[in-house]
Swiss-Prot record:
One of its GO terms (molecular function) is isoleucine-tRNA ligase activity. It catalyses: tRNA(Ile) + L-isoleucine + ATP = L-isoleucyl-tRNA(Ile) + AMP + diphosphate. Catalyzes the attachment of isoleucine to tRNA(Ile). As IleRS can inadvertently accommodate and process structurally similar amino acids such as valine, to avoid such errors it has two additional distinct tRNA(Ile)-dependent editing activities. One activity is designated as 'pretransfer' editing and involves the hydrolysis of activated Val-AMP. The other activity is designated 'posttransfer' editing and involves deacylation of mischarged Val-tRNA(Ile). This is Isoleucine--tRNA ligase. A motif ('KMSKS' region) lies at residues 599-603. GO terms for cellular component: cytosol. It comes from Francisella tularensis subsp. tularensis (strain SCHU S4 / Schu 4). Keywords: Aminoacyl-tRNA synthetase, ATP-binding, Cytoplasm, Ligase, Metal-binding, Nucleotide-binding, Protein biosynthesis, Zinc.
């Protein structure tokens, strides 16, 4: 037996089988850094049509989590796909750097501002801390393969950004959207500050639920309201509340004019309840012997006075539209400084707006009985006092959804304070924003209804904060009237100039006289701006001013929680400052959860960190998982899920390696064969690749990365792995090295690789770079500067063997493989090359297969394949799952060729080559080698 190894075209490539990504990726990153790859992309695509994806700033505090990674990877995939489509698609990373979380971190080390450290030094430490956090996060984002202008990111602490925020505020004021108000706002006692809607999250809380008796002062008026002559016992209006701590601030009881109310006798007193709530309320009280005396409407109760349950003051019964008979008692305790509806009613009736609770959550000195106590701790004392005064009708506990601070996770209170607001009604901002939402494309489509509902119902935006670390609200107000200084716009621009030079310290360290001359009449506002105003201003501070970008952005892409956050604040700032929406399209992705759908939590031990993933499996595995997951809903990740992703990656890598290994020795300048002269199967491979590329570009343009990933995987495993590459192995390995059949396949492979590497590049950025380095090419451009491959061809419309034809051949081949597997299991054959395949076909299928002539066997990877009419079928033939087709498999008895492993009667025909077939002899000894037309 001779050794024919040297006569075979064995695969060879520098592209390794093992990814070893965790070790290779840092080296590839280092190469990109040295190449200045992002700068080269910008130079190469300068002047092209722009595509701007505006980066929503992550908060500069702590290492990135997997949610951050998903967000940046999705953005990177979209940017890279747009670059492949020929757009100038810059990516400028941004960071949110002011606000409470950074303050808290600095407080841990240095203490509170103004106490153990000066406010000026405190701000310097905050700035230093934020910059350090940015560098930590930046390193992680870069490690994920995300390309961007990392050397010039936009930080909200950049002096120019801070200055442009002030200029944006000036435009908002100039357009008439700013208002000052004394209103109830969500207040965090731990923050010591008001919170915006976006900073409020809801969580379950157990609260006291009490029914309180307000004694009616004038029983005669009450009797008259119920159509009675008189009442011989005391009567009480019953209110139900889950916030006993607000009772010291009670100034009224609200009823609804349209509701019916019942007067009920219980032993020796009367109570008033909404008629529809009588039965369930008495059941709650466990009272069975009550007697309904009379019924009246709410409008007849208004104006009647009641006694406060523990203070010596009287409170009126008033009409309130917000009162319903869905729950409670139908009578509502009203504390104007602790609720929006209460406040509205209080303003309407000129009720006292005395403040009983300080910013730290403790009662003020003017609060009788409870001065200095923390409100939530005072609940028990208040309930006890009500019991002592016989004003407690019922006491219970209730678990309900309650607003909490997004940062501290502690319960909030509504507290009326003087604040600055962007008004939703002045200048019609709400209506304009709602119209802008309609003019924006939202995906998923439910995003539109979600943000519409939020904007429709939201209160005015409280933009003032009582914090140290933030951009100032640099206003001057009259000491008596509290009106804005008449030159406010001019002053703001003056402040902005100073901040652009020296940062926000230029305001905080300045004297008022540096900005105004009338210091005797005007005082400066000491508040800072809501941190959501920082990020919400990014369209004005970045897109509208940076000539490298454009306004509005083509795309915003963030987590689904940003409908109430950045999407909304960006819209409100842009509409109030510029009068147009900041984005054309808004896409959202779901939250990352574990395989059981649970939120990531250290306590559950289910946290998957991006650092662990890229240090073990590699960033490309994380990128592939991100792309493969339908990000419109929750995105499940776990070690098991990532293991499956790694298996998929290996299949893709193996396909790429097989393709590259069969391009050894191929010169694209001299060896390319024209499409019309290729073997027909190679024509199909190129046309099929073109079909897939068209689909892939289409779904990339729709940001459907999971569909892209599915198409790439299907292409590699089914169209290539299970069909084309399986068939051409024989031709690639055994045909004449420089012969037409092999060069034809290499031409097809060359085109396939050039298309495939581009499809992969946005997702598998590191691996695509590695593939590109191992690919024969006629360009020196790095893969990041390439556009979609244009060397693919489609079949002519009149082509006989078109894609439809080959799809039918694939179906027939699948059926043959099914029958081969049956015969393997029956031990008739061990491999397909041992099989003699006879296909019995009806006229239609016969005509299809006949076109392939004696090359049918190569398509079926068998040593012998015969085609016969169906009428000649034998009893041993097996019906295919295709009408008009039967398949018979027998074991071939002819000798095995030691070179190609086909069984052939021609083995030994040539005395010089006794152990190989005549086809192999031809490939070894002749100049042209064998010829192929179809396969």
């Amino acid at each position: 037996m001779s050794d024919y190894k040297d006569t075979l075209n064995l695969p060879k490539t520098s592209f390794s089988m093992k990814g070893n990504l965790a070790n290779k990726e840092p080296m590839i990153l280092n190469k990109w850094e040295k190449q200045g790859i992002y700068k080269k992309i910008r130079e190469h695509f300068a002047g092209r049509e722009k595509f701007v994806l505006h980066d929503g700033p992550p908060y500069a505090n702590g290492s990135i989590h997997v949610g951050h990674a998903v967000n940046k990877i999705l953005k990177d995939i979209i940017i890279k796909s747009k670059t492949l489509s020929g757009y100038d698609a810059p990516f400028t990373p941004t960071w949110d750097c002011h606000g409470l979380p950074i303050e808290l971190q600095v407080e841990k080390k240095h203490g509170k501002a103004g106490q153990s450290i000066s406010e000026d030094d405190f701000r310097k430490e905050c700035r230093k801390y934020a910059k350090k956090q940015v560098e930590i996060q930046k390193k992680d984002f870069k490690r994920l393969g995300v390309l961007g202008d990392w050397e010039q990111p936009y930080l909200t602490i950049n002096f120019d950004y801070e200055a442009n925020m002030i200029r944006t505020l000036a435009k908002i004021i100039e357009n008439g959207h700013l208002s000052k108000g004394f209103k109830p706002v969500h207040w965090c006692t731990d923050c010591g500050s008001a919170l915006a809607e976006a900073e409020v999250e809801y969580a379950d809380k157990v609260s006291p639920a009490i029914d309180v008796k307000f004694k009616i002062k004038d029983k005669d008026k009450l009797a008259q309201a119920f159509g009675l002559d008189s009442l011989n016992h005391d009567a009480f209006a019953i209110i139900w509340t889950t916030t006993p701590w607000t009772l010291p601030a009670n100034q009224a009881i609200a009823v609804n004019n349209q509701l019916n109310y019942s007067l009920i006798k219980i032993e020796d007193f009367y109570i008033i309840l909404a008629e529809n709530l009588v039965e369930q309320t008495l059941k709650r009280y466990a009272i069975e012997n009550a007697q309904i005396i009379a019924t009246t409407t709410g409008n007849k109760l208004t104006g009647i006075m009641a006694e406060h349950p523990f203070y010596s003051r009287h409170v009126p019964i008033l009409h309130g539209d917000h009162v319903t008979d869905d729950s409670g008692t139908g009578l509502v305790h009203t504390a104007p400084t602790h609720g929006v509806d209460d406040f509205t009613l209080g303003k309407e009736h000129n009720l006292s707006m005395e403040i009983f609770v300080k910013g730290n959550g403790c009662y003020s000195e003017n609060t009788k009985l409870f001065a200095g106590e923390f409100i939530f701790k005072a609940n028990d004392r208040i309930i006890e006092l009500l019991g002592e005064k016989k004003r407690l009708m019922n006491s219970d506990k209730i678990k309900h959804s309650y607003p909490h601070c997004w940062r501290h996770k502690t319960p909030l209170m509504f507290r009326a304070t003087p604040q600055w607001f962007i008004s939703m009604e002045k200048q019609g901002l709400r209506d304009k924003a709602l119209q802008a939402i309609k003019e924006t494309s939202w995906a998923p489509s439910w995003g539109q209804a979600r943000i519409e509902g939020m904007v429709k119902d939201r209160p005015d935006w409280c933009i003032s904060r009582q914090r140290t670390w933030g951009v100032p609200l640099p206003l001057f107000i009259h000491k008596e009237t509290e009106e804005l200084h008449p030159n406010t716009i001019e002053i703001l621009h003056k402040v902005a100039e100073k901040i652009e030079k020296d940062g926000i310290e230029a305001w905080f360290n300045a004297d008022d006289c540096e900005f105004i001359t009338e210091t005797a009449q005007y005082k400066s506002v000491k508040d800072t701006l809501d941190v959501w105003f920082d990020s919400g201003s990014s369209s004005m501070c970045i897109l509208d001013l940076d000539k490298r970008l454009s306004y509005p952005a083509d795309l915003y892409l963030e987590g689904s929680d940003q409908h109430r956050g950045w999407f909304q604040t960006s819209l409100l700032v842009a509409m109030s400052a510029k009068g147009s929406q900041p984005y054309k399209e808004v896409f959202t992705h779901g939250f990352v959860v574990d395989e059981h759908g649970r939120k990531m939590s250290k306590s559950l031990g289910n946290v998957t960190s991006p650092q662990d993933i890229y240090n073990t499996l590699g960033a490309d595995i994380l990128r592939l998982w991100t792309a493969s997951t339908d990000y419109k809903s929750e995105m499940a990740v776990s070690d098991q899920i990532l293991k499956r992703t790694a298996d998929t990656y290996r299949r893709l890598r193996n396909t790429a390696r097989f393709l590259l290994s069969n391009l050894d020795g191929f010169n694209p300048v001299t060896d390319i064969i024209e499409f019309d002269k290729l073997v027909k199967l190679d024509q199909w491979a190129i046309a099929k690749t073109k079909e897939f590329q068209d689909k892939i570009i289409e779904v990339y343009d729709k940001y459907q990365t999971h569909t892209v990933a599915q198409l790439i995987h299907h292409f590699c495993s089914i169209e290539m792995g299970s069909f084309y590459l399986d068939i051409i192995k024989d031709r690639q390995y055994t045909a004449k090295t420089d012969g037409h059949p092999r060069k034809s396949a290499q031409t097809a492979i060359y085109h396939i690789v050039h298309a495939l590497v581009r499809w992969m590049a946005p997702i598998l950025s590191f691996t695509a770079d590695e593939i590109w380095d191992a690919t024969p090419k006629t360009t020196d451009l790095p893969i990041q500067l390439c556009e979609w491959y244009t060397g693919l061809k489609s079949f002519d419309q009149d082509a006989e063997l078109d894609l439809e034809y080959w799809a039918k051949i694939q179906e027939i081949r699948s059926e043959v493989n099914r029958v081969l597997e049956i015969k393997r299991n029956e031990d008739v054959i061990k491999a397909s090359l041992e099989a003699e395949i006879t296909i019995y076909a009806d006229k239609y299928n016969y005509n299809l297969l006949e076109k392939l002539g004696n090359e049918l066997r190569f398509l079926l990877i068998s040593s012998k394949a015969d085609l016969k009419v169906i009428e000649e079928s034998t009893s041993s033939s097996i019906a295919a799952n295709i009408p008009g087709l039967l398949i018979e498999i027998t074991k071939i008895e002819e000798p095995k060729c030691e070179r190609c492993w086909h069984r052939s009667s021609t083995v030994g025909d040539n005395p010089q080559y006794k152990d190989i077939c005549s086809r192999c002899v031809e490939n070894i000894t002749t100049e042209a080698g064998e010829s192929r037309e179809f396969a």
